[in-house]
């Protein structure tokens, strides 16, 4: 029976351990580590962050104990696509009134947002919140925190992700960098009347 490792086996084991040690002492998610580097508009009072891929893994590990909440407008949810397990409770609705200063259509806040979330989630439940790219979901996390929810994560890259920022690229301005839809994880256009 062989009990000693050869020099080559020892070296290989040392390399493997050197690669694994940083993973053991690192924060639990990349997104948590990057939290301080997030744009202010994507930061939340709870400070709980996940990427879309991390969020999907967290949901897969406990589908009955983790709720995915999509706070985009109903139109975005239906026509751009959505995570199949996501509940849609819009943080706001589109007003279709042009805001010349912001160069965008306006939004009307959803006054029933908290009450609608409480219909399927409790204040201590784990909730993973997404919007298009992380801005509205950060606002939603903060609103939920103010209402007493304590385990609410911000999906920092949202459903569509961040835009490509390369003027030389034909994809400049398109949301192709990250996000649920671009991460190779399940999404659909099919509505679920229960959600």
What is the meaning of each model-derived region?
Residues 12-25:
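Bacterial N-terminal signal peptides
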Residues 134:
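Conserved G/P- and acidic residue-centered "switch" motifs that form tight phosphate/ATP-binding loops
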Residues 67-72:
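Short hydrophobic beta-strand that contains or immediately precedes a catalytic carboxylate
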Residues 129-131:
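Short, surface-exposed ligand- or partner-binding patches at beta-edge/loop junctions that are enriched
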Residues 6-9, 21, 29:
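Compositionally biased non-globular segments, especially hydrophobic aliphatic-rich helices
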Residues 2, 27-64, 78-126, 137-195:
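Rhodanese-like catalytic fold shared by cysteine-dependent sulfurtransferases
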Residues 2-15:
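Bacterial N-terminal signal peptides that target proteins for export
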């Amino acid at each position: 029976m062989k009990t000693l490792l050869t020099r080559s086996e020892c070296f290989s084991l040392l390399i493997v351990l050197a690669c694994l040690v940083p993973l053991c002492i690192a924060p639990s998610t990349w997104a948590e580590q990057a939290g301080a580097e997030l744009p202010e508009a994507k930061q939340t009072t709870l400070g709980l962050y996940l990427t879309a891929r991390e969020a999907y893994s967290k949901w897969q590990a406990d589908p009955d104990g983790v709720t995915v909440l999509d706070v985009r407008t109903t139109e975005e949810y239906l026509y751009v696509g959505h995570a199949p397990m996501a509940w849609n409770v819009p943080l706001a609705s589109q007003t279709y009134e042009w805001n010349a200063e912001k160069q965008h259509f306006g939004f009307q806040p959803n006054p029933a947002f908290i009450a609608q979330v409480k219909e399927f989630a409790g204040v201590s439940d784990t909730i993973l919140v997404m919007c298009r790219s992380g801005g509205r979901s950060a606002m939603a996390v903060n609103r939920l925190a103010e209402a007493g929810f304590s385990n609410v994560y911000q999906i920092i890259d949202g459903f569509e992700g961040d835009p490509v920022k390369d003027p030389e690229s034909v994809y400049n301005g398109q949301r192709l960098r990250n996000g649920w839809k671009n991460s190779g994880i399940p999404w659909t256009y099919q509505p679920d009347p229960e959600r």
